[in-house]
A protein has these predicted regions:
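Active-site metal-coordination segments of metallo-dependent hydrolases
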Residues: 51, 150-151, 214-217
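Membrane-anchoring hydrophobic helices of lipid-metabolizing enzymes
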Residues: 2-121, 156
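A conditional alpha-helix N-cap/helix-loop micro-motif detector
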Residues: 99-100, 124, 150, 173-177, ...
Length: 291
């Protein structure tokens, strides 16, 4: 990394910290609103706004420009809420009124079976609460994450994530060869896996997603088959009052040798598509998913 890039990353990090400091006198509700609106304003000026619009038009070809713009504006606001909520992630998990849970019967059945499972979700609402929630409810979980380029922000985000964990049994591991090893060791030691499976994986398999063949991660399905792990959909949405709602849906199985990984991923993608169509404002449209 060159000196100038390092210096730029440092400036970005200090700017972020200064903004958070300046918001200190305001309530969390007001601060979150300021950050979310700022994200929307700045986001609309960035190149990612057009990427988001193109993605949205592909998924909703019948919507007009005004309707598409509204979805993308709300998506930018959701990202702003996420960024601010990351600064007090641990407190969010302690607030019993902030996160509403549905599908508790599914979760309790998994608890009683006491076998590792694969939880999956998408970049929707505040996805950062998922792993700490599982950990705080006694589900030892390993999660793979993609590090961001800014090393200072990356360190800060990692610390916020790990500080929100209740135990030392759960962990985060950066995507790569090391993560594959750590995740497998976790399964062997009766730990669960949590994955966000909606983003592009250049090394992945081409699977239909909203009618288009896209590179998709399917490696976790090989683990599910080998260790006979249930695959649990974990839907996550942001409610109108800015609270969060997590729904545990009925587990999927991948123990039929006649069903390929691609076919099973197609089933998972159909679940993801349903979630996105139900709550389009919540999804991370800015990612080059269909490129």
């Amino acid at each position: 990394m060159t000196f100038f890039i390092s210096f730029r990353y440092l400036l970005e990090f200090f700017l972020f910290k200064i903004i958070i400091f300046l918001l200190f006198p305001f309530s969390k509700k007001m601060s979150s609103k300021i950050i979310s609106n700022s994200f929307m304003f700045l986001g609309k000026l960035s190149k990612y706004n057009q990427i988001a619009k193109n993605n949205c038009k592909m998924v909703f070809p019948n919507l007009n420009e005004k309707e598409i713009t509204k979805i993308i504006n709300n998506s930018w606001q959701n990202l702003g809420h996420n960024l601010f909520e990351l600064t007090f992630l641990k407190k969010i998990l302690k607030d019993k009124n902030k996160i509403e849970i549905k599908g508790l019967d599914v979760l309790e059945k998994i608890r009683k079976e006491n076998l590792p499972v694969i939880f999956f979700s998408i970049h929707s609402s505040n996805w950062e609460v998922c792993v700490p929630f599982l950990d705080q409810n006694d589900f030892k979980t390993g999660a793979i994450y993609r590090h961001i380029n800014n090393t200072f922000l990356n360190r800060y985000i990692y610390k916020q994530r790990t500080d929100a964990l209740k135990t030392n049994d759960s962990f985060y591991t950066p995507k790569g060869k090391k993560s594959a090893k750590e995740i497998l060791e976790g399964v062997i030691n009766n730990k669960n896996i949590f994955l966000l499976v909606d983003q592009k994986d250049s090394a992945g398999t081409e699977v239909n997603f909203f009618g288009k063949k896209v590179k998709t991660q399917t490696g976790f399905l090989k683990i599910a088959r080998k260790y006979n792990l249930k695959i649990v959909p974990m839907k996550n949405i942001r409610l109108p009052n800015n609270n969060l709602e997590i729904t545990f849906e009925q587990p999927l199985l991948h123990n039929n040798n006649e069903v390929s990984d691609e076919t099973k991923m197609l089933e998972i993608n159909s679940i993801i598509e349903k979630w996105i169509k139900q709550s389009p404002d919540n999804w991370f449209w800015q990612h080059k998913r269909f490129n």
